């Protein structure tokens, strides 16, 4: 049975490309760029994001370097923070010329103040926002209904992206649907553990507590392409100059449509864009001429008890 959606012109369109057979969806990324090396980092770049002017509110957690949580809430809900008094900690911003400062009162408001001071420092002048993506990957969707499967930790965002695509796409002969994730990684803030431990009076639940050792900031984008060409042909265009394939009347992307959501600031609210020109501008200037440093996209945790790195396995 063929599924249908109604576009903004109230025309009934096939939700599934006509030339595909709808079996059980198996989601698989095709990676074009992946510079990640640290397997101990948790990616949190899409867990809390929302969409501007949609019923999909961003829920950015109250996190900062030095914050302490139970293991089972770390990188998930980030709730039940342990707010017992801590020793002062040294923060390091990994600019080319590192900026080092002491956070006397280890809490969120003090942390934000330290970021403001760092951004005004002479050390920050040595920092240039990266222009090369940290990660770019694509996946064939087969159906718009599969978008939600791409965001297992944020179904609301996936559902919103699906509905936006259903509303905006207006193509009669769709041969392929695909989604892409783009990550630009900015600077990292890390901490040194005080020699006499993090807590002034160690809590009784040391075994279950972990603290945020590093936070990495960056910007992200998610986009969906509906094309009258095959997925492999679309993927191939992004290995070269995709804008040539958009401007060329016979190009792979010339008749394609795109929904682009970009997330670039601490509020974690995605902006909606609808053209390949918008995507090109984002890829060329992801940090908006240095006017944004992004939002937390990676974090790393260590155990309070033994100061060893925390992973899901331990």
For each feature predicted by the language model, list its residue ranges:
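Membrane-permeabilization and membrane-interfacing ectodomains
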Residues: 4-314
């Amino acid at each position: 049975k063929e599924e249908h959606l109604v576009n903004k012109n109230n025309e009934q369109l096939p939700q599934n490309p006509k030339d595909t057979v709808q079996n059980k969806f198996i989601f698989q990324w095709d990676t074009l760029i992946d510079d990640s090396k640290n397997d101990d980092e948790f990616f949190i770049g899409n867990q809390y994001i929302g969409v501007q002017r949609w019923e999909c509110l961003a829920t950015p957690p109250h996190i900062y370097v030095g914050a302490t949580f139970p293991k089972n809430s770390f990188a998930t809900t980030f709730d039940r923070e342990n707010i017992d008094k801590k020793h002062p900690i040294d923060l390091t911003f990994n600019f080319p010329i590192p900026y080092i400062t002491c956070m006397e009162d280890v809490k969120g408001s003090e942390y934000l103040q330290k970021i403001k001071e760092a951004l005004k420092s002479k050390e920050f002048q040595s920092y240039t926002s990266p222009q090369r993506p940290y990660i770019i990957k694509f996946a064939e969707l087969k159906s718009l209904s599969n978008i939600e499967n791409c965001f297992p930790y944020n179904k609301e965002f996936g559902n919103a992206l699906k509905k936006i695509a259903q509303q905006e796409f207006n193509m009669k002969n769709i041969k392929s649907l695909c989604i892409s994730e783009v990550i630009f990684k900015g600077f990292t803030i890390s901490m040194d553990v005080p020699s006499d431990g993090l807590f002034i009076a160690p809590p009784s639940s040391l075994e279950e507590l972990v603290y945020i050792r590093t936070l990495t900031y960056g910007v992200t984008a998610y986009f969906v392409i509906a094309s009258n060409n095959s997925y492999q042909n679309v993927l191939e265009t992004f290995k070269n100059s995709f804008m040539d394939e958009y401007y060329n009347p016979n190009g792979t992307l010339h008749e394609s449509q795109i929904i682009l959501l970009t997330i670039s600031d601490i509020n974690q609210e995605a902006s909606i864009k609808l053209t390949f020109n918008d995507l090109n501008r984002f890829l060329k200037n992801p940090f908006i001429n240095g006017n944004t440093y992004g939002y937390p996209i990676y974090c790393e945790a260590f155990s309070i008890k033994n100061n060893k790195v925390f992973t899901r396995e331990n």
